[in-house]
Amino acid sequence: MKPAMRRRAFLKRAGAFTAFTVLPARLLRSETAPSNQLTRALLGFGGIAHSGNHLGYKATRLVALCDPDAKRVQDGIAQAEKNGYGKIFACRDFREILARPDVDIIHICTPPHWHGLMSVMAAQAGKDIWCEKPMTRTIGEGRRVMEAVKTNGRIFRLNTWFRFQSGFYGFGTEVKPLKKIMENRLLGWPVKAVVGSVTGFSLKFGWSGQTNIIPQPVPADFDYDLWLGPAPFKPYHPHRTHGTFRGYWDYDGGGLGDMGQHYLDPVQYLLEKDETSPIKVEIDCPPQHPDAVGSFRRITYTYADGCQIVLDGNDSLQGAPFLEGPKGKIWPKLKSDIPNLEAIVAELPEPAPQQTDFVESVKLRRAFALNERNGFRSATIVNLGIVAMRLGRGFAFDPVKLCAVNDPAADRFIYQPMRSPWVM
């Protein structure tokens, strides 16, 4: 398919699905289906799609997958059969999957430069969405995803889970006791959170790009133009794609883009900021290459009520608490200067329950715990930091208008154009 025909052809093919914007297609066809089990398709079959959690997720039935790399398509077919799914539909172009009536859930496992556009197109095609982190590569794309999910009545799940289950990386406890502490203001208010290796969170600066790569021929079995999609055209080099794409601004944001939403979404939840964003970003970082992601020494986010998040990139805050308020501090493993803290926490009421069963969310049309709205806000923290890195300075942000304050240079990174013919 020629590039200029992409959007028009997709909309023509997807038009038949506009009626399916309330209930999943599988449930609408339940009278002829062998079961009411929801069906799922994987868009992208790289490292994350190979994980046992995704291939082994039997609450839905995997029926399709795609990847612009033909070798990965063949690998996906083999892995699906190995995991008991039998023969599935597999292709290179994701639009073929969006046009299929037998797919209920689109699971986006691509590099982040595709997350926003695929989410919007999936919503327009009447599919529910399971998207890997970060939710989107830019704030503008995230805003558009929120609009598309709402307009089309879809259910959206962002795949980071530390606000509601499992351990909190290297912190040494779960988020729930921290939430109880914060809800009951045991630390006072406002609160500062420090995120870095000193508090148990690796910022993974190893995800940096190369600045001296020499263009190479595109492999015959790899559709590089489709892999780039909405990203600016750059000559092919294997380091720009597959397992090392995170080191380039066009596709992700290095270690901050990779791990930032995992770490910062629970912090946002603890600070009660699911419906807003920082009003100011400050940064200390070396000059950044225009193409390859580098590192930073410190990023500080400030909210309107005085709460702060500090990303410590060079371990300069040795001994710093993870959470600090006017009444107390908390370090990893729930160590604190508040006497008998664990006993106090044990007596506190439980936080409000969260909707953490995605299949139930889809069937009952109930918002998932981490959805397009609060997921957008935690992705915005990540993307504000990335904008500051690329600018080499801080800036003010309007969390209502979702733009920089009197700063066109910052807005050019917040709202980035897509490579023609791709549009949102």
Identify the meaning behind each predicted range.
Residues 2-131, 140-155:
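N-terminal glycine-/serine-/threonine-rich beta1-alpha1-beta2 phosphate-ribose binding loop
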Residues 11, 74-77, 95-98, 107, ...:
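Non-transmembrane alpha-helical segments in soluble domains
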Residues 128, 136-221:
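A contiguous active-site-proximal alpha/beta segment in oxidoreductase catalytic domains
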